[in-house]
Amino acid sequence: MELVPAIDIIEGKCVRLTKGDYDTKKVYGDPLEMAQQFEDLGMRRLHVVDLDGAKSKHVVNIAALKAITTHTNLVVDFGGGVKTDEDLVMAYEAGAAMVTVGSIAITDPDRYLGWLQKYGADKLILGADVRNGMVSINGWKEDSDVRLEDFLLRYMAAGTKNVLCTEISRDGTLEGPAIELYKSIMARYPECYLIASGGVGSTEDILALEAAGIPAVVFGKAYYEGKISLSPALLKRDGRKSKIVNCKLSNSKLTSC
């Protein structure tokens, strides 16, 4: 499976939360230094979340994204606060290979579908953040009235390929991922490139997700807290299925891929 380390950013610093609660913020240092550390260890992908952006409903930490994409060769997906066409283009121009969007697919479905058509399914990741079976939005501060099943049904049928699913009650707890939830998604949508997120607390959790047939996993706090080690043995299991490379935007069209 594909291993995807995560960097969450608040006020330009690398942080982790527990269950999306901003009051539980723990600071781990500089995002660029952490990204370079992941690259030095042999990682190829990176998931970057602008938590300030998610909370304020517009992209905030674009400078941190730009620094990472400029000074590393990591393939970066970026999310958090992407609500407008300008936000999306800004993220791509700052070097994001993919952009994760979730709230907009709830609040403005036509805009998400327009992006899907314009930029293509390979350039977007649908963020499916779930709490008690319902999709949450805006930095997990609000619960929508949309069930996860209905959310996925609509957008997989529309051509979505990549889904990042976070079980909010597990996120940052290190108590283990929601494997049964992810298995149920894969059973219904075997064509989905599902990225599991939330709860990973050990190497065994990663191996369990791999055994369950989950294509990719995001992890963060488990690494920062020393619960998992990016050992050569684990890195050998990193099957890079993403074929995305960093692309440039010219007049809102993708070039130089």
Regions found by a protein language model. Name each.
Residues 2, 22, 71-78, 121-125, ...:
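Short beta-strand/loop segments at the ligand-binding rim of alpha/beta enzyme cores
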Residues 8, 38, 46, 91, ...:
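Conserved, mostly hydrophobic/aromatic
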Residues 11-12, 16-22, 96-171:
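Conserved anion-binding
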Residues 72, 76-98, 180-216:
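Catalytic cores of alpha/beta
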Residues 90-111, 167-169, 198-205, 212-232:
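Glycine-rich phosphate-binding active-site loops on the catalytic face of alpha/beta enzymes
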Residues 238-257:
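Short, basic, low-complexity termini and linkers enriched in Ser/Thr/Gly/Pro
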Residues 45-61, 103, 165-175:
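Glycine-rich, proline-tolerant flexible connector loops at the mouths of alpha/beta enzymes
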Residues 52, 60-117:
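Glycine/small-residue-rich loop that forms an oxyanion/phosphate-binding "nest" at active or ligand-binding sites
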